[in-house]
Amino acid sequence: MPAPGDQHSRISNPFEDVKPRVSEYTAQEIATLQTRLERQLGPEYLSARAGPSGQKVHYVAAEKVIGLANEVFGFNGWSSSIQNIQVDFVDEHPQTLKISLGLHVVVRVTLRDGTFHEDIGYGHIENCKGKAMAFEKAKKEGTTDALKRALRNFGNVLGNCVYDKAYLAKVTKLKVEPTKFDELNLHRHADFAKKDVVAEPRLPPVKPEPSNTASAAPHPPLPPLPEADSFDDLLGEFDEADFCVVDADGHPDEVVLPENSHASGSSGNTGASTTNRGPGAPSGNQSNQQRPMQPSSRMNLNGPAGRPQPQTPNHQINRSGPQNGSINNQQNNHGMRPSPHMANQGRPPPPPQNNNNTSNGTGPHQRPLGNGPQQNTPPPNNGAATAPSGAEPVAFFSARAVARVPDDASLPPPPGTATPTALFNPKAESPSIRKTPGIDHSSSRPVSRTGQHVPAKPVQDGGGLANDNPSNNAGNGVQNQPQKPQPSQQRGSILNPQFDQSRRIGAPGGAASPLSNRNQYRPPTMMKRPPLADVPNGTSNGNGTPGDSKRMKLN
């Protein structure tokens, strides 16, 4: 059991002196400190001020002394304490009420091992406006002075060397170079500090070393990938017809010739080029300089048999062959055009091509003129109208045609042929797209406000365009091709109404709009006012007529 009174032993007596914690220096640390303290300061640590009799007084500033103490002893190797502050005098002027006072301060500097030095410092002020300001200035001055005097007791490096006149006479002659300000040495806030992005060094590419396949360990199998969700959520709203895929079952009216029909149709017309040349036909040299026209894939699919064809813009024109059909379409749709040899004068002639049908200077592109009915003579495969070597006919195919190619297909189909499922049909109509009933969506025609097509204006007599091709009208008994009705020249521009100069505003057939004369100036019509009738100033004796408003009524 504890003895009586032991419970009070744990509490320190506040009236006893506190023994500081002492950490003894080793002999090596004492020798190191002694060496540092004996060294003298350089000229960069000294400062000078004007003293009595015009002399310079050298001293060490307080901030430099504190920095030297932290450098020599360490920031936790020394401490300072104020031992006493005593006011010597305080005087107040009776008239101005200004304060003058003086006081002295005793400061002790203690090291880690308990070694300390004390010294006195003095502070004063004269004619200060207030007492608080006077005491603040005097106490700070006395404390700083006492601290510097206490630190100089430790050695030369803390300011004691300043009292050596021989040392001052030599050190003041040294020139101090101005220090270069370095921004990197500043302690900056994290938000304002400049962050230099250090680029990571790129490692050189590692060359793959040849490894022995027999000794190399096999790679672990890859983890199975999760099964992908079905695309019903993504493509469920679309229909197969939206992709414009030609389906043989969905379009039974489109017929495609088999592959053997192309060969039979081209081989059976080898003697068609021996017809006589007309007076207006170009010479043989001009025909050889014509550019060969490449038949498209749609032309190759249509033979001279005249079978039904897919929907095309010019379905009313009966095509007699690849070359004849293309020439007729160009002449009927675009009017008169210059001949090929005139159009090609500005361009360099293409290299000559081998043509087997050179008799009488006629080429496969020329159309014969005769008294009998014209015959459709498609050019042979070896004529000049065929595509040059290395060029293939251009056509659009469906993306689904690749999936329908069998895996055992060894040879590709011959150029110029295509299956009905592979061709891309731009005229395919999708049943999933909403369309207004009663509107023809295959053509661009004006629509009235009632939602119906505007009927076309009747064609005037002779208003249709005549066939500009002289070869179509040269033969006897040859019927002209049916022409599409051409719109009247007085008809306004429907596609671009802003370019129509005869545009009218309002309902058709109504009165002219007053805004139609906006581009002309018309002066306002001024009607001449009739003169006033003469009215007598005198009054009558009451004999006036009762209907006269100018006379006074007596009754």
Curated annotation (Swiss-Prot):
Instruction: Give a GO cellular-component term.
Output: nucleus
Record's subcellular location: Nucleus
Matches recorded under InterPro entries: DNA_recomb/repair_Rad52, Rad52_fam, Rad52_Rad59_Rad22, Rad52_Rad59_Rad22_sf
What is one Gene Ontology biological process annotated in the Swiss-Prot or TrEMBL record?
Answer: double-strand break repair via single-strand annealing
Q: Which Gene3D superfamilies match?
A: DNA repair protein Rad52/59/22 (3.30.390.80)
Q: Where is the composition biased (Low complexity)?
A: 260-276, 354-375, 382-404, 479-490, 536-547
User: What is the induction note for this entry?
Assistant: In response to MMS and UV treatment, and in response to heat shock and oxidative stress.
Comp. bias regions, Polar residues: 283-300, 312-334, 468-478, 491-500
Extract the ranges annotated as region (Disordered).
197-232, 251-555
PANTHER family from the UniProt entry: DNA REPAIR AND RECOMBINATION PROTEIN RAD52, RAD59, DNA REPAIR PROTEIN RAD52 HOMOLOG
Similarity comment: family membership:
Belongs to the RAD52 family.
This chain's protein is named DNA repair and recombination protein rhm52
This protein's species is: Pyricularia oryzae (strain 70-15 / ATCC MYA-4617 / FGSC 8958) (Rice blast fungus)
Read off the lineage from the record: Eukaryota, Fungi, Dikarya, Ascomycota, Pezizomycotina
Q: Which gene encodes it?
A: RHM52
